[in-house]
């Protein structure tokens, strides 16, 4: 299959990437951030806690955290041992607790206790890197951003949108292919697809809506009936219906 794409032009790549995004929009019409939050501060905290953890584990942990710590000042003044105990289930709790306390301090001292809405300012916050900043901008403030997590990077390389490994380079490469107003939604769609269909070890190729545009089609079972059991998540019925099953 690799030879099929060896002569793809830049224009051809742009058209294919945008066509794949439209197909993903049909497959996942109601994408969203899978971290639970009600404010920019809650999303920032949840995203920091999600490092080396799962969204499911974070969502089980944050209700108690958000009830106890309601403001940046609360985090700044938190008893470290108590905070560590709250967030222990997410892993690396000592480092994360230190980051959250310093985050609260930075927000109180420099931003009047509010999470800023620019990449430049977000970058200055403890525990906030580019991926976290894009999550916050896109989901708390409606500012388009591409979130390059493990799933996103793996899939766009599998699709040959880019060969880059560095997340920042991946972000820029994909940003040149897809319309800016689609960046946040694209991020969710790709992550949903990676978690539900395009698995790392055994993708469900035979029921994938991207099959005709995917250079890696065939990495997983191509027979629909063999691929169908691999599809995960609450959208499984919809995805299988799109595949004619």
Curated annotation (Swiss-Prot):
Cofactor note as given: Binds 1 [4Fe-4S] cluster.
Family membership: Belongs to the Nth/MutY family.
CC cofactor: [4Fe-4S] cluster
InterPro entries in UniProt: DNA_glycosylase (IPR011257), Endonuclease-III-like_CS2 (IPR004036), Endonuclease3_FeS-loop_motif (IPR003651), Endouclease-III_FeS-bd_BS (IPR004035), HhH-GPD_domain (IPR003265), HhH_base_excis_C (IPR023170), Nth (IPR005759)
An example Gene Ontology molecular-function term: 4 iron, 4 sulfur cluster binding
UniProt protein name: Endonuclease III
Keyword set includes DNA damage: yes
Pfam families, sorted: EndIII_4Fe-2S, HhH-GPD
Any Gene Ontology biological process: base-excision repair, AP site formation
Keywords annotated in UniProt: 4Fe-4S, DNA damage, DNA repair, DNA-binding, Glycosidase, Hydrolase, Iron, Iron-sulfur, Lyase, Metal-binding
Reactions performed catalytically: 2'-deoxyribonucleotide-(2'-deoxyribose 5'-phosphate)-2'-deoxyribonucleotide-DNA = a 3'-end 2'-deoxyribonucleotide-(2,3-dehydro-2,3-deoxyribose 5'-phosphate)-DNA + a 5'-end 5'-phospho-2'-deoxyribonucleoside-DNA + H(+)
SMART domains: ENDO3c (SM00478), FES (SM00525)
Residue ranges constituting the HhH domain according to the UniProt record: 119-138
Function (record text): DNA repair enzyme that has both DNA N-glycosylase activity and AP-lyase activity. The DNA N-glycosylase activity releases various damaged pyrimidines from DNA by cleaving the N-glycosidic bond, leaving an AP (apurinic/apyrimidinic) site. The AP-lyase activity cleaves the phosphodiester bond 3' to the AP site by a beta-elimination, leaving a 3'-terminal unsaturated sugar and a product with a terminal 5'-phosphate.
Gene3D superfamilies: Helix-hairpin-Helix base-excision DNA repair enzymes (C-terminal), Hypothetical protein, domain 2
PROSITE patterns for this protein: ENDONUCLEASE_III_1, ENDONUCLEASE_III_2
EC annotation from Swiss-Prot or TrEMBL: 4.2.99.18
Ligand binding ([4Fe-4S] cluster): 198, 205, 208, 214
PANTHER family: A/G-SPECIFIC ADENINE GLYCOSYLASE/ENDONUCLEASE III, ENDONUCLEASE III
CDD domains documented for this protein: ENDO3c
Disulfide bonds: none
Enzyme class: lyase
């Amino acid at each position: 299959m690799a030879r099929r794409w060896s002569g793809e032009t830049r224009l051809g790549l742009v058209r294919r990437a945008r066509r794949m995004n439209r197909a993903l929009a049909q497959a996942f019409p109601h994408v969203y951030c899978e971290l639970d939050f009600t404010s920019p501060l809650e999303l920032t905290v949840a995203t920091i806690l999600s490092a080396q953890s799962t969204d499911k584990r974070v969502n089980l942990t944050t209700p108690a955290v958000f009830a106890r710590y309601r403001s940046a000042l609360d985090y700044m003044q938190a008893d470290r041992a108590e905070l560590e105990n709250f967030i222990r289930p997410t892993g690396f709790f000592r480092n994360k607790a230190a980051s959250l306390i310093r985050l609260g301090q930075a927000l109180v001292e420099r931003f009047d206790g509010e999470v800023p809405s620019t990449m430049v300012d977000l970058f200055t916050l403890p525990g906030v890197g580019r991926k976290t900043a894009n999550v916050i901008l896109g989901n708390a403030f409606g500012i388009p951003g591409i979130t390059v997590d493990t799933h996103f990077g793996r899939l766009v390389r599998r699709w040959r949108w880019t060969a880059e490994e560095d997340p920042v380079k991946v972000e820029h490469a994909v940003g040149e292919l897809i319309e800016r107003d689609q960046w946040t939604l694209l991020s969710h769609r790709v992550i949903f697809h990676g978690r539900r269909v395009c698995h790392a070890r055994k993708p469900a190729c035979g029921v994938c809506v991207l099959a005709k545009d995917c250079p890696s089609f065939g990495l997983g079972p191509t027979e629909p009936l063999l691929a169908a059991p691999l599809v995960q998540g609450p959208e499984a019925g919809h995805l299988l219906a799109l595949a004619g099953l």
